[in-house]
């Protein structure tokens, strides 16, 4: 009888049937706030969107962050994060990078932060060309766990360690990697000239 009363109260909205899970907020800004001060051309800024994403972080708690990406990839990115959340694949944080600087000494190094849009040059190349991150068409996941390893042995970010046995690390056997590839993304861990384990990119349709 007691269970039946509780169920009726829950259905009436008087007594919660299941206590809502507390979500840790890592980022909660508008697109304008995320892009404030960027040196990107206006046509690039106009092509971007922001998405709220949820993920389990390394503390085991559910977090909510944000990703700025090209607007045509918004639903793709939301789906990818939903997949990682359901897989309990840990993400350190997802906070928009709100300044234009090289990777060294910024979000990648200090926060192990996952992100998409970042108006910058390619950090793994010396030719000075723009990264696809400059257009929000790539996403980096847990850079410390999934660093870029150049042909000369240099690791970016400095201090990053690639160990497949550590949670939050991407590998060719990872369901996360397989899901990205299934939906048309290219993974930097499959490159031959260098290994960029954190990196996924996708050409626009």
Where are these regions (language model features)?
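Sec-dependent N-terminal signal peptides
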Residues: 4-14
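Residues in and immediately flanking transmembrane alpha helices
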Residues: 15-16, 146
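Boundary at the C-terminal end of the N-terminal hydrophobic targeting segment
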Residues: 18-20
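Cell-envelope/glycan interface and biosynthesis
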Residues: 22-190
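Basic/polar, cationic surfaces and motifs that engage anionic cell-wall
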Residues: 186-205
């Amino acid at each position: 009888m007691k269970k039946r009363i509780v169920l009726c109260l829950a259905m009436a909205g008087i007594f919660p049937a299941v206590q809502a899970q507390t979500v840790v907020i890592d980022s909660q800004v508008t697109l304008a706030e995320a892009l404030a001060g960027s040196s990107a051309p206006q046509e690039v800024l106009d092509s971007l969107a922001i998405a709220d994403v949820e993920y389990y972080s390394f503390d085991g708690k559910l977090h909510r962050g944000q990703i700025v990406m090209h607007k045509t990839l918004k639903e793709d990115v939301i789906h990818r994060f939903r997949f990682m959340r359901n897989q309990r694949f840990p993400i350190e944080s997802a906070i928009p990078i709100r300044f234009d600087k090289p990777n060294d000494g910024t979000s990648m190094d200090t926060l192990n932060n996952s992100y998409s849009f970042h108006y910058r040059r390619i950090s793994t190349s010396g030719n000075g060309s723009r990264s696809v991150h400059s257009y929000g068409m790539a996403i980096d996941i847990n850079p410390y766990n999934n660093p870029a390893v150049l042909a000369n042995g240099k690791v970016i970010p400095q201090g990053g360690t690639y160990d497949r046995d550590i949670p939050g690390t991407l590998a060719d056997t990872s369901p996360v990697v397989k899901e990205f590839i299934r939906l048309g993304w290219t993974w930097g861990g499959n490159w031959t000239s260098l290994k960029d384990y954190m990196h996924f990119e996708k050409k626009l349709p």
